[in-house]
Amino acid sequence: MTTTVRTLLLALILGAALPPASAQTAPNARVYTIELIVFRNMSGQGGPEDWSVKPVARGPDTPDAPVTGKFVQTVPASQFQLNEVARKLQNTANYQPIAHFAWQQTASSWGSRAGFTVAKLAGSAPGLSGIIYLESGTYLHLGMSLNYQTSNPPSGLAAAPGTVFTLSEARRIRVDKPSYYDHPAFGVVALVTPANRSTGGR
């Protein structure tokens, strides 16, 4: 994705109204709400690549005694906080949401790559599969390894029908601040918030 396109999309996302951020107090929140919008990039800017090469998210070695996060519950659409972002994406020609879902969980240990499948978190999301993981160490990280298959990829990507595109990335995140994960074929807007406001988050 070109710098110009990325800048325009970030402006769109960050310009959407979000609830005011809470003060980040003690870094000991145990349950987090995670909300994701996965959207298709219809513009196809970025140029042809070898789409058979699957990227791998960088990170530390697997810990000796990894802790796996616990799935708490699915969050209903009535409690979504990124609806304004979703609406703005729907009103563009180039970025169309393909899945919007949220859930609550505790964090896995840093480097464990222990997460939950899209099927568990989102149910039926045509063409979309993979895993999403939340890790806690010195900082909080949200990572994902997502596959998106479409019968009509954007022509600019020079990809055959049915090509499987892979987005694999892990990054440090801040609670209450939207994060953006991009790929020439599709992208993700993510928001992590503490489920219990009284405990804060890191």
Label for each model-derived stretch:
Residues 1-9:
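Bacterial N-terminal signal peptides that target proteins for export
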Residues 17-20:
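N-terminal signal peptide c-region/cleavage motif recognized by signal peptidases
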Residues 23-173:
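Extended, low-hydrophobicity segments enriched in charged/polar residues
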Residues 166-202:
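C-terminal partner/receptor-binding element of secreted or periplasmic proteins
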